[in-house]
Amino acid sequence: MTGRSIIVMGVCGCGKSTIGENIANTLNAKFIDGDDLHPKANIQKMASGTPLDDIDRAPWLERIRDAAYSIETKNETGVIVCSALKKKYRDQIREGNQNVQFIFLDGSKSLILERMRARQGHFMRETMLDSQLETLERPEQEPSVFTISIDGSIDSIVDAAVTVLVGNINE
């Protein structure tokens, strides 16, 4: 079996880190939080309430792509969480990688805002949600992208994601 990278994607506050870590635990996979791969300047910019632009995101997306490549070349399974909001970002992550799958965590703005208000100590302010929703290019009809609703418990979301991933190992 070849390595496989699973990218858990969506806007801020949709539960990427929580769901991604649980998927990784369930699949006995490596977990990488994409927030940890941001250059310090990006985190400072977002913490100040300023959205990132494509120039800001470029080195971060390279790090995500390289992490996926490392996982695949080691014949491991890994879960990486990152927003991957635009198709061109997802294509950049796919570049040079043979086995990348995306889990798109999809939910209403009101549900995401509710969850953002409940979390503590995250650099991303809830005011950034509108910017991310405007930037989001929904991954409809893209290969190896599976949309999972975030309406429901963490366990039900993880179960839905794992079910679709296990059923599509060689896609």
Regions found by a protein language model. Give the residues of each.
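Walker A (P-loop) ATP-phosphate-binding motif of ABC ATPase nucleotide-binding domains
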Residues: S5
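Small-molecule kinase domains that catalyze NTP-dependent phosphoryl transfer to phosphate-bearing small molecules
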Residues: A118-A160
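Hydrophobic anchor at the beta1->P-loop junction of P-loop NTPases
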Residues: V8
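P-loop (Walker A) phosphate-binding loop of NTP-binding proteins
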Residues: V11
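Conserved phosphate-donor/acceptor-positioning beta-strand/loop module used by diverse small-molecule
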Residues: G96-M116
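Loop/turn-to-beta-strand initiation segments
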Residues: K74-G78, Q101
